[in-house]
């Protein structure tokens, strides 16, 4: 079954218009994409590696995906993290950090600061083939391995200093 999105207007407000994934989004409307960074107390960030059959296959990213109809950004980020990495982040602990407007979608960036360094993951095989904890300075040395613009949004919305 195909994903159904609820489209947004240019102010990120829900329009009530339902839209099937894979069909071109009409001009002036947008769908919502969320990304959620997971950070351990020691500062390491979770990266997951995209399945090779997906666009940008084998590139690294934080958990991300499209919000489905009925979800807001926090709920979509919670679901994506749980589905892709098997990590449960309480809704109240998911922090909205900012958004970026694109031609037909918005990307909302979220952060979950884990209270513990002892986090295990359970990967969704259809979406993700590997995961690792990486220090931010290591990521900066290997930006060509990440999906485009991901680290720019991290720097804009999350990185301090």
Question: What is the meaning of each model-derived region?
Answer:
Residues 33-57, 61-64:
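A glycine-rich, hydrophobic loop/mini-helix early in the fold
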Residues 12, 40, 89, 98-120:
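Active-site-adjacent beta-strand/loop module that shapes the phosphate/pyrophosphate-binding cleft
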Residues 32, 106-110, 132:
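Short beta-strand micro-motifs in enzyme catalytic cores
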Residues 122-152:
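NUDIX/MutT-family hydrolases
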Residues 21-25, 95-101:
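Short, solvent-exposed loop/turn elements at beta->coil junctions and helix N-caps
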Residues 1-35, 41:
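Acidic, metal-coordinating catalytic segment for phosphate/diphosphate chemistry
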Residues 46-47, 62-95:
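The catalytic Nudix box helix
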């Amino acid at each position: 079954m195909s994903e159904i999105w609820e489209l947004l207007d240019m102010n990120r407000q829900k329009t009530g218009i339902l839209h099937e994934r894979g069909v071109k989004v009409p001009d002036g409307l947008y769908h919502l994409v969320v990304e959620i960074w997971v950070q351990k107390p020691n500062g390491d960030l979770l990266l997951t590696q995209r399945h090779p059959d997906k666009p940008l296959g084998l590139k690294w990213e934080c958990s991300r995906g499209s919000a489905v109809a009925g979800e807001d950004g926090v709920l979509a980020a919670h679901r994506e993290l749980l589905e892709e990495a098997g990590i449960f982040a309480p809704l109240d602990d998911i922090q909205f950090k900012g958004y970026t407007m694109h031609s037909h979608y918005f990307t909302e960036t979220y952060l979950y600061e884990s209270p513990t360094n002892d986090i295990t993951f359970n990967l969704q095989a259809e979406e993700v083939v590997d995961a690792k904890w990486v220090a931010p300075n290591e990521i900066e040395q290997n930006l060509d391995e990440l999906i485009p613009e991901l680290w720019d949004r991290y720097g804009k919305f999350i990185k301090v200093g």
